[in-house]
Structure formats: structure tokens, C-alpha cells
């Protein structure tokens, strides 16, 4: 008898937005046209901050990828990342393949108990790691900005995600 084939799991970023912050997004750009990045009010780290990053498991190969991708953000932002074993690190990364890919947004990490992850990298294909680090430094999805200029075909979106 043939073994049943499992349908592939959808790989999406799961928002970790605290309830009090829903719908308080603010664009980081004031230029006309589409906004490329947004930061929820009060979620970005202080300019020049060094954010400590701790791994909660994972392999040496996974750690290497994370460090490379964090380095990209360090080059393009006014933030630095220090990889430590300290339990009170601001960013704590787990690698649970059953929990998807997600990150709390920016300074929300401060309110998460020190023994819990603030980011999970259940898969690391494509730009997933860099994407989640964008959230960790305080950026949200640009489509969440009401002024972002995206015209949704709501019926098509619902149909796509309902199947």
C-alpha cells in the first residue's frame, strides 16, 4: 500500500503583535508613493544600540546563517548585534520546525519572559532569517500600513488562504 503524501505546509511569517498595539502603525517614510517599511509606534530600538542575541538550541550551521543575516541589518541600520549566552539577551532565537517563522516586533522583546524565545526560525529558506530580524529591530509588514498604497483584492486573498 502506498504511503500517503503529506501536503506541504505553508511557510508564512506569523505576526507577534501585542494586543495593545494593534492598528498603531506609523510609516518610517514621509515621501509620496508606497511606503517600503513601517515601524509600529515606540517599537524601534534606540539609535546606536547593541542588541544581545542568544540561541535557544539550533545547529552550528543555523547559527552561522543567523549571524550572516544579522550582519546585513547591522550594515543597513544604526544597530549592532552581539551573540551571547546571557539569559537576559534582548533577542532569543529558537529553531522549532513545528512553530513556523516569527518574531516579536522590536522593543516588545523586553516584555517577554527571559526563558522564552522572542524569535523562532522553524525554517530558514530564502530571506526568512533577514525578514524576521527586520521584525526584531522594530519593523512591521509594509502591507499593514493603511497608507501603504496596496490595493487588495480581498475576495482573492480569502479564496487563496481558505484552500
Enumerate the predicted regions with their spans:
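Zinc-dependent metalloendopeptidases
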Residues: 1-163
Amino acid at each position: 500500500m502506498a504511503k500517503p503524501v503529506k501536503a506541504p505546509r505553508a511557510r508564512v511569517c506569523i505576526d507577534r503583535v501585542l494586543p495593545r498595539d494593534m492598528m498603531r502603525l506609523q510609516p518610517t517614510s514621509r515621501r509620496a508613493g508606497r511606503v517600503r517599511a513601517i515601524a509600529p509606534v515606540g517599537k524601534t530600538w534606540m539609535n546606536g544600540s547593541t542588541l544581545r542575541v542568544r540561541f535557544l538550541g539550533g545547529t552550528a550551521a543555523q547559527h552561522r546563517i543567523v549571524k550572516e543575516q544579522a550582519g546585513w541589518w547591522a550594515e543597513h541600520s544604526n544597530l549592532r548585534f552581539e551573540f551571547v549566552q546571557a539569559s537576559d539577551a534582548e533577542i532569543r532565537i529558537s529553531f522549532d520546525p513545528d512553530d513556523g517563522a516569527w518574531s516579536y516586533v522590536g522593543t516588545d522583546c523586553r516584555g517577554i519572559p527571559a526563558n522564552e524565545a522572542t524569535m523562532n526560525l522553524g525554517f530558514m529558506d530564502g530571506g526568512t532569517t533577514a525578514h524576521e530580524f527586520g521584525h526584531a529591530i522594530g519593523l512591521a509588514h509594509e502591507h499593514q500600513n493603511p497608507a501603504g498604497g496596496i490595493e487588495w483584492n480581498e475576495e482573492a486573498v480569502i479564496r487563496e488562504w481558505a484552500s
